[in-house]
């Protein structure tokens, strides 16, 4: 096992050394990677659940580059900019990074992708992950990006439609679903309209409910009550589903109101939602590192198609189902990757 680990490490170092040696010889400097994060400086771990912004974080991306043989200060330079949770700072921070003339910029979440894309049309940008609608607008063509942006998507419309279908399977009497969306997130603000055709086939009426952050929740809850909703759907938005305190507050209120919650965030079922159909965001961030590796090796953005997740984690919460008087169908239990007792 030790010999195998040594060989894997050696291969990674050799693989990365050739392009970087050529780079240094040609330019007289180390390649520079700009990293734009909506989170905090202290938020550099790569665990499945972290304290503040529980997206994949730059730590998972850096972990991916280390696995490819990159070492900050030795054969690459990382320039970080952190918004410290204030996503309105992202445009200014993206402009700062551009002024440093990095060879490639990495970012994640919809806010980071939009800010970086607006700051430069020349420097290659790798996003991973971010919402599908946002990446489609920035890259313009998934198969062969025609702009300077590529990367991996966070979720897809089809994934959320399937999650809505799972909600109906688990709670068959569901007829009115409140879709909690952040109007400040361009990837999700139109989601009630995007999901409406699929909802109609299931006999479900959707109502969009807006909330930008925890401060907006009391008003959002009042609107959900007024809508007559008998279930709730949470998109995988960093400010709502992606922040532990806000997510748990939403789920506690939903349980008190006896509303089953479905979400495309893999963390929701674990915290008391009924069902989640989510992605492994840490793996997607590590995948984004391979894009940066290829760009530093000479690849053009147009040669790097945008990738969509190919696997999803289905989680169902049996405790929540019991509290709501629901029985999880055996076929759903058989398909589930995780059953929370």
Label the predicted regions.
Residues 1-341:
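Short hydrophobic alpha-helices and adjacent helix-cap/hinge residues
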């Amino acid at each position: 096992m030790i010999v195998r680990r040594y060989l894997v490490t050696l291969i990674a170092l050799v693989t990365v050394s050739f392009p970087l040696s050529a780079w240094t010889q040609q330019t007289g400097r180390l390649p520079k990677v700009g990293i734009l994060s909506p989170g905090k400086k202290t938020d550099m771990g790569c665990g499945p659940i972290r304290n503040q912004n529980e997206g994949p974080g730059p730590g998972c991306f850096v972990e991916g580059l280390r696995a490819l043989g990159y070492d900050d200060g030795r054969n690459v330079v990382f320039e970080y900019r952190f918004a410290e949770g204030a996503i309105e700072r992202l445009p200014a921070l993206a402009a700062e990074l551009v002024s440093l003339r990095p060879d490639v910029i990495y970012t994640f979440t919809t806010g980071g992708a939009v800010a970086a894309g607006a700051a430069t049309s020349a420097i290659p940008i790798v996003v991973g992950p971010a919402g599908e609608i946002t990446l489609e607008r920035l890259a313009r063509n998934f198969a062969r990006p025609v702009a300077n942006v590529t990367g991996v998507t966070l979720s897809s419309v089809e994934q959320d439609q399937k999650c809505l279908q799972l909600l109906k399977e688990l709670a068959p009497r569901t007829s009115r679903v409140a879709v909690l969306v952040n109007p400040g997130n361009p990837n999700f603000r139109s989601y009630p309209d995007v999901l409406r055709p699929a909802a109609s086939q299931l006999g479900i009426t959707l109502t969009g409910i807006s909330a930008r952050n925890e401060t907006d929740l009391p008003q959002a809850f009042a609107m959900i009550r007024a809508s007559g909703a008998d279930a709730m759907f949470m998109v995988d938005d960093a400010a709502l589903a992606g922040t532990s305190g806000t997510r748990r507050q939403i789920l506690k209120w939903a349980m008190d109101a006896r509303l089953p919650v479905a979400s495309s965030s893999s963390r929701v079922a674990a915290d008391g939602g009924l069902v989640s159909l989510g992605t492994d965001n840490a793996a997607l961030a590590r995948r984004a590192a391979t894009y940066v590796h290829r760009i530093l090796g000479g690849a053009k953005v147009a040669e790097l198609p945008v990738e969509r997740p190919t696997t999803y984690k289905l989680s169902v919460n049996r405790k929540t189902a019991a509290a709501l008087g629901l029985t999880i169908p055996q076929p759903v239990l058989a398909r589930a990757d995780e059953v929370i007792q």
